[in-house]
Amino acid sequence: MTGKATPEASVSTSEGTAPEPAKVPTPEPSGQVAASESTGQEQAPEPQKQPQAQDPAAHEAPATPATTKPEAPSEDVPSAPLQLTLEDVSHSSLTVSWEPPEDLGSWGSRAMCWSSVREGASEWVPVNPRPVMVTQQTVRNLALGDKFFLRVTAVNSAGAGPPAVLDQPVHIQEITEAPKIRVPRHLRQTYIRQVGESVNLQIPFQGKPKPQASWTHNGHALDSQRVNVRSGDQDSILFIRSAQRSDSGRYELTVRLEGLEAKAAIDILVIEKPGPPSSIKLLDVWGCNAALEWMPPQDTGNTELLGYTVQKADKKTGQWFTVLERYHPTTCTVSDLIIGNSYSFRVFSENLCGLSDLATTTKELAHIHKAAITAKPREFTERDFSEPPSFTQPVADRTSTPGYSTQLFCSVRASPKPKIIWMKNKMSIQGDPKYRAVSEQGVCTLEIRKPSPFDSGVYTCKAINVLGEPAVDCRLEVKASATH
């Protein structure tokens, strides 16, 4: 590299000075370049070529400047571009950006041209065949593994100014993605299976290039006779055809890539039904109650117990009925036993797989004896519910129209049930077919069928029992309709 940019000014504008095409990086088309400082998409005109640009010395290495080319006055050419920055590097492209020079020269800066040189080489190769009016550019189709030094030069009609050069070479290499394991949500807690069921775990992971995946069981290598593992580019599958309790434990997946690694642990628990309680004992029997005690099972099925189920059976019927479910203590009292019966009891253990296949049953029976009880009845005074008749709702006065049946109502309360008598103008009307008397649940009704003005008068309802005979009166007026 050299600080003199004048010998390369004409080289950067000449398309014939590039080396063999296979080694020249391809710049991004001008239509795809982000020109933050340019005034349009048009390319800047080429700088005026000096007569000395045709000198073969212009194609020599930057370290040997041409002696026949006069240098342009420093106040005419622009200064070096500012803030030359490498924005992005991938496996086949790179993007650089820069700021316009602080001093544009007396002629003014017209465009930028930039060039590259491979690490270890001495000749700068123009990247863009013509100067461009942009401050950012992307070069594509780069060879994997190459290293480049980059520089950018401001150009105007007076020539090229001093270049801005990147301090470090740019290495075109394959992008490495750190390995990462994505454990499915249902495997973040203990994965529970029953004995005999299959275990099929698919764990996705990320990493580029393809990482190496390996499994361990409780810190040891897997038993290839029981466990099958298949690892692909994006996931690893662990398969156990028929799980046994010995397969329980912590399985750890390790993904390694170029000195980086990621680990994920999965806890697997293989369970089965528990055994029955070790023993059961009938502690005591009193009244209609029986006390029981038992010992926990020797085999819990490789998991915690959810409790015990206690059942009772009458000796006469032999049918079992559940008394307690998922009961945690190992002692209980069974109540509400029927006097005169004999009972036996049994206890099951229960875990996530269900109840134990067998139960522990008491050897002796619990006899509920009938105690001798002498009844001593207390004196009882019978209550007198007798009540004289009383009208809770008297009969109301009414006005009726001739030819339309009307009804009189009242309600009476009495014990014993009273006899109801209806009267008109103090004369009994019992048995008269014109009147219909009904008494039901204390409600007394007198229906007068198609009354006429002759039926007007004072009606009386009398209730009679052994305790009294009160009466209530009302006035009925039957008015003839007006004629026109």
UniProtKB/Swiss-Prot annotation:
InterPro entries per record: FN3_dom (IPR003961), FN3_sf (IPR036116), Ig-like_dom (IPR007110), Ig-like_dom_sf (IPR036179), Ig-like_fold (IPR013783), Ig_I-set (IPR013098), Ig_sub (IPR003599), Ig_sub2 (IPR003598)
Protein family: Belongs to the immunoglobulin superfamily. MyBP family.
Modified sites of kind Phosphothreonine: 2, 6, 26
Function recorded in the entry: Binds to myosin; probably involved in interaction with thick myofilaments in the A-band.
Source species: Rattus norvegicus (Rat)
SUPFAM superfamilies noted in UniProt: Fibronectin type III (SSF49265), Immunoglobulin (SSF48726)
Residue ranges of domain Ig-like C2-type in the record: 179-267, 389-479
Alphabetic keyword roster: Cell adhesion, Immunoglobulin domain, Muscle protein, Phosphoprotein, Repeat, Thick filament
Listed SMART domains: FN3, IG, IGc2
Protein's name in the database: Myosin-binding protein H
